[in-house]
Amino acid sequence: MAVFKTLTDADMAIFSAGLVAGVDEVGRGPLVGDVVTAAVILDPNRPIAGLNDSKKLTEKRREALFDEICEKALSYHVGRATPSEIDELNILHATMLAMQRAVAGLARTPELVLVDGNRSPAFTHQGLSLTSHSIVKGDGLIASISAASIIAKVTRDREMDALDAAYPQYGFAKHKGYPTKAHFDAIAEHGVFDQYRKSFKPVKALLER
């Protein structure tokens, strides 16, 4: 299938394919917190300049685009899977579940779902089965996936900032829950709490000591 690098080209796809939802995830690698996904249906009549893979944008730019996406999108929804669901299902299946929840929560029914990466779960919306495709590095190629990556990234980063306020000794505002040396040092000193993913090897090893 064609890959569209600009919003103008994506608009053309929307006109031919109907409503297109972009889906992306953030937070598969961290040791703590939910895996967060987002689904976004952009409005071709209200283009958003500067959409890109959220990891390639500054925090200030992501925050500005987050607000613009929320204002201009036809629909968007955040889906998540909790640490307990990640431990029960494994991170891959929990991520697929979170993506399904994001699409199911959209206020509009998309005719096509485009997912960043090389895997796509089966999507339904209000009882209807949806066509979906996965696109490797789609968050840098497809406007709606870029928008979804920004919504998911800003949402999860804000949650890590809130967790940092509650547990400042762990440094979540800096490492966002990822397995850095500073994070390992913090959990070695302070232990883990209920939002940690207990099936992840570093956490599991600590609990088994």
Curated annotation (Swiss-Prot):
Protein name in UniProt: Ribonuclease HII
Purpose of the protein: Endonuclease that specifically degrades the RNA of RNA-DNA hybrids.
GO molecular function: manganese ion binding; RNA binding; RNA-DNA hybrid ribonuclease activity
GO biological process, one term: DNA replication, removal of RNA primer
Stored InterPro entries: RNase_HII, RNase_HII/HIII, RNase_HII/HIII_dom, RNaseH-like_sf, RNaseH_sf
Entry's family note: Belongs to the RNase HII family.
Binding site for a divalent metal cation: D24, E25, D116
PROSITE patterns (alphabetical): RNASE_H_2
The RNase H type-2 domain, residue ranges: 18-209
Broad EC category: hydrolase
Annotated EC: 3.1.26.4
Cofactor binding notes: Manganese or magnesium. Binds 1 divalent metal ion per monomer in the absence of substrate. May bind a second metal ion after substrate binding.
Co-factor(s): Mn(2+); Mg(2+)
One cellular component term from this protein's GO annotations in UniProt: cytoplasm
Keyword vocabulary terms for this entry: Cytoplasm, Endonuclease, Hydrolase, Manganese, Metal-binding, Nuclease
Subcellular location: Cytoplasm
Swiss-Prot/TrEMBL catalytic activity: Endonucleolytic cleavage to 5'-phosphomonoester
Coarse class of the protein's main subcellular location: cytoplasm
Domain of life of the source: Bacteria
Record-linked SUPFAM superfamilies: Ribonuclease H-like
UniProt key word Nuclease: yes
